[in-house]
């Protein structure tokens, strides 16, 4: 008790001997620190998700589009290795070495923008892009500063893998396709865990400009970006030469795939009871498909 009182007296004496200016500065600094601690919302994303139903092995049985008309599967907790390697190589090479903001990337982007007299590079890290996706605000200088501040705060709260999962779950992939899982099924007809290197590379470059490069237009640009990324992966020895040759020979998908609708009545039921969530059933997808085919014939 005496020790606590002694410490309190020391703190009071410290403040008594401070000038008014120093007290004001200390108060401002304290408010800024408190503001920084609480500046990040507890929940970053406030968006509706698709209702997704899988079999007992996690295979997709069917899904219902989100209430805002987007194919946005519920957030995933992990990122497949191929996508992780592709994203970091393409978007943020120093992802594991910065605290949300990469000064080198910012400096390089500033130089390129001044040299070209227009914005050709943003210098945003994956953490900053995650904040941008969550805020969905106009891209201004002031907003960029806010993104940088919130990105550093997010780095204190979440692990690198959690941040990467947030990004891949909410990145735009063209049209009404949002997030890695929806994109994998819509563009390639299978789960993100089964993506090839070519497919992973295509999806890694797509959020960079989803309105300009996609399957219906800008296919040459999309293919060039994909192959350029694959070459970077080869140069970094992430993939070998035979894997590279096979990957660049893979064609782009022609058009989006329809999502599986193996158990539509079950999907409708979960849509009513567990809308916007993943629901794993005890059904075997292979058996369910066999029964459906036998029934329709």
Listing of model-derived features with the role each one plays in the protein:
Residues 2-295:
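Juxtamembrane regions of bacterial inner-membrane/periplasmic proteins
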């Amino acid at each position: 008790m005496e020790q606590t009182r002694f410490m309190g007296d020391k703190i009071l004496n410290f403040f008594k001997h401070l000038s008014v200016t120093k007290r004001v500065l200390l108060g401002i600094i304290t408010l800024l620190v408190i503001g920084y601690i609480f500046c990040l919302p507890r929940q970053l994303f406030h968006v509706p998700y698709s209702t997704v139903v899988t079999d007992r092995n996690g295979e997709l049985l069917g899904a219902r589009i989100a209430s805002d008309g987007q194919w946005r599967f519920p957030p995933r907790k992990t990122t497949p290795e191929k996508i992780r390697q592709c994203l970091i190589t393409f978007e943020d090479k120093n992802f594991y070495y910065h605290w949300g903001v990469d000064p080198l990337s910012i400096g390089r982007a500033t130089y390129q923008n001044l040299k070209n007299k227009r914005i050709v590079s943003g210098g945003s890290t994956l953490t900053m892009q995650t904040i941008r996706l969550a805020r969905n605000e106009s891209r201004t200088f002031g907003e960029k500063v806010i993104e940088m501040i919130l990105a550093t705060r997010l780095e204190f709260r979440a692990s690198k893998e959690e941040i990467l999962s947030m990004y891949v779950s909410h990145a735009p992939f063209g049209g009404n396709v949002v997030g890695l899982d929806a994109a994998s099924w819509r563009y390639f007809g299978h789960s993100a865990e089964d993506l090839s290197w070519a497919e992973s590379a295509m999806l890694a470059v797509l959020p960079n400009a989803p309105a300009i490069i996609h399957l219906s237009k800008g296919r040459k640009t999309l293919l060039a970006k994909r192959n350029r990324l694959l070459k970077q992966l080869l140069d970094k020895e992430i993939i070998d030469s035979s894997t590279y040759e096979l990957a660049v020979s893979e064609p782009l998908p022609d058009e989006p795939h329809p999502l599986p609708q193996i158990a539509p009545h079950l999907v409708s039921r979960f849509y009513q009871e567990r809308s916007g969530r993943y629901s794993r059933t005890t059904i075997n997808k292979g058996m369910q498909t066999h029964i459906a085919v036998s029934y329709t014939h």
